[in-house]
């Protein structure tokens, strides 16, 4: 006996729940099938007496992320700003350098030129890549066959800019520079608003968090949908051969629907049997886009001692020996539960996973003591962590990455429906893909695709512009005249070389005219 509905949504993360809410609000009968014993997917808010609440998964929202800001406001959630009142720290070559702003200060003029050229070049290349179709970029194939390592080897002249660029890639996509396609990474940064927007706290992707945690987004939608959300129901089979689509779960329940939305990471499609089989390109795509590796760590202290030292808690930490590359203040907005959240990224997540939880905590405390220059960092009162690589119903975090050559070959099928199956999930977004914002955009777009297929809305209403959030307005990202026009290091050397040749030629000509050159 099967349960009948209009649409089955596979996956109860933010994308699936946003899709289900829109369809429900449009008068359709929706059922959400979630494999875990909770909703939220790659967002997860843990609650206990030691932490009150803490986001162990996706957490940050900021300006230009208007879908998630609108949805969360509808659900009655509020945001607060991540602390960045005091100074940030850039720790490199064993020393800490305080700074303010989005990027670390650079005083060496040659190094400054190289850093400036790095960010400018990535943004310039990104502007050539269409957000909704990166494979259509003029140099798409050339850039897609190149790893970010190869690109950075071409762009970076100094070791300083190279190391910061490696950290930037690790942090943005939780993968190594040799693992990801240059085309895909440049697209990823571009569709998040560029290097400054994605890297910044204030006026950037990490500006805010939700009071009470981001897990509430999915939880409050579940409250609205009631028993239409079925937990502990991993989907194992989708059959489209009949009049309706049949969806079977691991506990052998059957659900019958007119349409299905798959709102799980593409690779998790491999856990589902399809009848008829998936088309060739979709079948191969899902084997080729792994997720990144990250352990999220939160160290709690009695006091936010770093603030007393005029540090906000934001730390950019270079070096192979440092377990964490990036840290932020995670103290509650009322000042309670002082904490530092650190991201253990890419190969370091795989390396440190071999240690015990206690050993990881000690390494983190030792690092923070060194970077902050305070022994107080050695005395935590509590510790929480989440290794997303262990999650069988995520496969990793934050998002799926594209190795070289995959985007141009398979990217077109990411959002392409397969019969009556439509695809959501943050990976399929065109703006802030990889974030909660992208998850909402993708879920609502997939829902509207079904509404259009049912004849309820015209095709031009599938993709709708999202008005800017009134509560979290975006300030434009600006660059100075010098930042736009300063030469790169090779450009400067070429300029010096040409100037030297020109000067020598001019002096020779002048000497000749005045008869100062002696004939032999």
Curated annotation (Swiss-Prot):
The record marks 156, 365, 382 as: Important for catalytic activity. It comes from the Eukaryota. One of its GO terms (cellular component) is mitochondrion. It catalyses: a secondary aliphatic amine + O2 + H2O = a primary amine + an aldehyde + H2O2; a primary methyl amine + O2 + H2O = an aldehyde + H2O2 + NH4(+); benzylamine + O2 + H2O = benzaldehyde + H2O2 + NH4(+); (R)-adrenaline + O2 + H2O = (R)-3,4-dihydroxymandelaldehyde + methylamine + H2O2. One of its GO terms (molecular function) is flavin adenine dinucleotide binding. InterPro entries: Amino_oxidase (IPR002937), FAD/NAD-bd_sf (IPR036188), Flavin_amine_oxidase (IPR001613), Flavin_MAO (IPR050703). The chain crosses the membrane at residues 490-516. The modification S-8alpha-FAD cysteine is found at residue 397. Keywords: Acetylation, FAD, Flavoprotein, Membrane, Mitochondrion, Mitochondrion outer membrane, Oxidoreductase, Transmembrane, Transmembrane helix. The keyword Transmembrane helix applies. Residues 517-520 are mitochondrial intermembrane. Gene3D superfamilies: 3.90.660.10, 6.10.250.130, FAD/NAD(P)-binding domain. The keyword Transcription does not apply. It is an enzyme of class 1 (oxidoreductase). The modification N-acetylserine is found at residue 2. It holds the Pfam family Amino_oxidase. It is a single-pass type IV membrane protein. It is found in: Mitochondrion outer membrane. Its cofactor is FAD. Residues 2-489 are cytoplasmic. Its EC number is 1.4.3.21, 1.4.3.4. Monomer, homo- or heterodimer (containing two subunits of similar size). Each subunit contains a covalently bound flavin. Enzymatically active as monomer. PANTHER family: AMINE OXIDASE, AMINE OXIDASE [FLAVIN-CONTAINING] B. Belongs to the flavin monoamine oxidase family. Catalyzes the oxidative deamination of primary and some secondary amines such as neurotransmitters, and exogenous amines including the tertiary amine, neurotoxin 1-methyl-4-phenyl-1,2,3,6-tetrahydropyridine (MPTP), with concomitant reduction of oxygen to hydrogen peroxide and participates in the metabolism of neuroactive and vasoactive amines in the central nervous system and peripheral tissues. Preferentially degrades benzylamine and phenylethylamine. This is Amine oxidase [flavin-containing] B. It comes from Bos taurus (Bovine).
